[in-house]
Amino acid sequence: MLSKIIIIIFIVINFINIIISSITFDIDCRDIINGGINPSSSSSNSNSGSDYSGEIILNLKNKECKDYHIEELLNNYYIQNNNNNNNNIITINGNETFGTTIIQSKKQPFLNLINDNSNNSTTTKSISLNITINNINFNNWITPILYMETINNNIDFINTNFNNHSNEILISYPIISNNDSNDNNSINKTLNSINLNNCKFENFNYLTKLNNLIMPIKLKQTSISVKTSTFINLSMNNTFFHLNQSSLTISNCSTNNITTNNFSFITLINSPTIISNYNHSNSNGSFINHINNNNDLIDFSNENMLIEFSNFNNNLILPQPQPQLELLEQRLQQLNNSDYNNNNNNNNNNNNNNNNNNNNNNNSFNENINGFIILDCENKTEKANVLFYSNQFINIMPYNINFNYSIINIKNINLILNNNNIINNINSNSNNNNSGIISKANFNNQNLIHIVNSNLTLIDSKIESDNPIGGEYSTVYIDSPSNDKIGWNKSNNTNSSDDDDSNSNSSSSGGGSGDNNSIGSSDNSKNKNNKLEWCFDCDGCVFSISTDKNVTLTNSDICPDPDAPNNSNDNGNGNGGGSGKKSYKNTILAVTISAIGIICVALLLTVVILKRRNRKSSFDYLLINQYYLDDEEEKRELLLNRNNNYYYDNNIIDN
């Protein structure tokens, strides 16, 4: 009997909980404070529309509003009316405590801005919605949170969490039927605006086989701004941001532990981008892939504003090969296709004039690339710090590659190449037709590396050129030697004017710039007989470099010892001089070495004296035991009292 009563009570309690939950859902999740709208009454008249335009505030007070959608409200009062009133404002608020209002969905998008097809119209409508979402935690979402087919919307996500997502796009771009091309002329025709402020994206899993093409944020002709947001523990088989004919601004954000299966975290197609104060760490794949038919792969230009990086925690780290290689890999896959090979075999072989013996090989073709990496911060007050670590800029590939720009073109950049290979004009010596035709890269009268007002440091890196480009188009071209700091200047000019740097600490008069990276730098325009003007400060590098006077530096021309005497003549009239800061540093180094030497000598003498004393004492001990073996008393006295040194041996004394 008692068990039956307990079961009945349990059933009643569950029934009451269900009723309370539904009441809470109806009240808290649809509590409209302003506007006087009753969604439940309007749903029965959804086809008639409404002339209402104004402000609606939805306060979602419940902590878990499951399966709740507001697309019905938006459709009934805005979309079907095709209302162009800019006063259409919708504010959706969660609890004031950040992240406590949790919304989950398994049916429809949270914001579903769709077209009205009642009149069989496919024209994208302008409804001019201003939607603000505050303090919402979207958890375990498997449908798009925001889907847009309408235009002229401004949507702000503030203090919003996106947690534990899988299987679906978060924010999708509008369908633009009338202009769905990659035409650069439409790049500024932004149709929607999205702002993510103080948001968090974490614990995404898009690694299932069905989601190879899923990108969490995919936008077209949309302006998106991401500020003070974090991206943590995201696993995908594709890029996270995919923008086409859009604009992207990212500031004060960070990524940590991102897996994109070697895709870029951001993919841009004809989309200007500004990125500042960003920290990208513990992630595989390159950070950004910029695809633009008429522009460089990566551009740090303030003028074009294609991509600008600044304040990357003092360093910009690009850990993987740059995405232009992905294009070449796609081409290689095309080559493996039999139809492609059959249709293009003759053209490919005819284009390769250097491999006439391999005309039957299907693995060669011509490819044009509009540059590789352009780092341009010319207008910045301070040089940008950029680190390329473990990159293979040009691998040994079966391609004829035509570069229209230098691989690396830097202006006002501190560039560090750590464990990099920059290889140009690599030819295969193999006679195996199955190995592919390894041809050369043609830079179309461009330099492999072009340096303007920049610092370049090589660490365990290689710069090669099997076939010198020749002329002024050299492997490395230095545009402004007076400002560039690449190793040390080796000019031996003795006719320079007095151009002593005001910041120099040199004790000599005239002649050298006090720059840390120069030795006896002077005006070399008066002396045309200089054999070497520049050299690399290079740790374990193999390189070939030419200056604008076609002087080639080989491995034997690595920078001299900075402590070696300067060859410049110091006659008191501004000639020679050398680097003041270098001289100052040399003095400190000499004093330090001398002090260390004195300390070492003192320690050595101390050790010798102590050892000699020990040897003498041991010798005395042996003498005592040798000459006084028969006289135990005298031996004991000597052992215990000689110079108060207790060379005490119990075995001898006891015996």
UniProtKB/Swiss-Prot annotation:
Indicate, by first and last residue, each region the UniProt record lists as having compositional bias (Low complexity). Answer: 515-524
What GO CC annotations are associated with the protein? membrane
From the record, give the cysteines joined by S-S bonds.
none
Q: Where are the transmembrane segments?
A: 5-25, 588-608
UniProt keyword Transmembrane helix present: yes
Q: How does it sit in the membrane?
A: Multi-pass membrane protein
Region of interest (Disordered), ranges: 337-363, 484-525
The record's subcellular locations are: Membrane
- Domain of life, per lineage: Eukaryota
Task: Supply the alphabetized keyword list.
Answer: Membrane, Transmembrane, Transmembrane helix
Protein's name according to its UniProt entry: Putative uncharacterized transmembrane protein DDB_G0293652
Give the originating organism.
Answer: Dictyostelium discoideum (Social amoeba)
